[in-house]
Amino acid sequence: MARRKLVYEGKAKTLYEGPEPGTLVQYFKDDATAGNGEKRDVIDGKGVLNNRLSEFFMKGLGNIGVPTHFIKRLNMREQLIRAVEIIPLEVVVRNTAAGSICSRLGIEEGTPMPRPIVEFYFKNDDLNDPIVSEEHIIAFGWAAQQDLDDMVSLALRVNDFLSGLMLGVGIKLVDFKIEIGRIWDGDFMRLIVADEISPDSCRLWDIETGRKLDKDVFRRDLGDLADAYTEVAKRLGIMPQGPVGAIKPTLIN
């Protein structure tokens, strides 16, 4: 069998050339990293859970008219996605203080934000993804002002959807990050949500207990990461059948 062409390999996902022009296959790995890759481990079943969870969130966004790169899930670890031109920015929405904003601004963890705050970070591992202003983004040509306005609008729509969804299953959406890409329909360019939405890219706290159900479990050595992600999947009704760790990757050619 012919091997698929590798397009890109990141810390948690691998992209392969898709079966049709303009498509890619996104493979979710079991690798867990923190501190820009300084802390690493392999968590059995993490890729399976993130594939299912990201599919669930992307489908839900599509159902309310938020465009995403998701086409369909192929198997337990892979999904077919649209190829996009990724804007080199991480878009972060914060509802509650946690993570870097606490140390940067001296805010106590758990403090509610007065309103959802949208931040931009330049995607560059060598620089540890520094926070940047809209002035930087426009001056360096990463995105135009209209793009930025559209990105903020997209991010806030994602926030409204995820916040309500999580609230319904007893989880607080503390913050999340997304990536946004450009696609062209003829001469018309539009922006869509890309990458993934999963507990790798969100902070999720149990509303009653404050238990962390996201990658902070790994960052802070708070317990079993797969257990936390499984709890999120169970509450949302998308828990895969059978023991997650026993599910092996299925390659397609």
From Swiss-Prot:
Entry keyword annotation includes Flavoprotein: no
Pathway: Purine metabolism; IMP biosynthesis via de novo pathway; 5-amino-1-(5-phospho-D-ribosyl)imidazole-4-carboxamide from 5-amino-1-(5-phospho-D-ribosyl)imidazole-4-carboxylate: step 1/2
Catalysed reactions, semicolon-separated: 5-amino-1-(5-phospho-D-ribosyl)imidazole-4-carboxylate + L-aspartate + ATP = (2S)-2-[5-amino-1-(5-phospho-beta-D-ribosyl)imidazole-4-carboxamido]succinate + ADP + phosphate + 2 H(+)
Biological process annotations from GO: 'de novo' IMP biosynthetic process; cobalamin biosynthetic process
Annotated Gene Ontology cellular component terms: cytosol
SUPFAM superfamilies according to UniProt: SAICAR synthase-like
Signal peptide region: none
Superkingdom per UniProt: Bacteria
CDD domains: SAICAR_synt_PurC (cd01415)
Keyword list, A-Z: ATP-binding, Ligase, Nucleotide-binding, Purine biosynthesis
Name of the molecule in the record: Phosphoribosylaminoimidazole-succinocarboxamide synthase
Source organism per UniProt: Jannaschia sp. (strain CCS1)
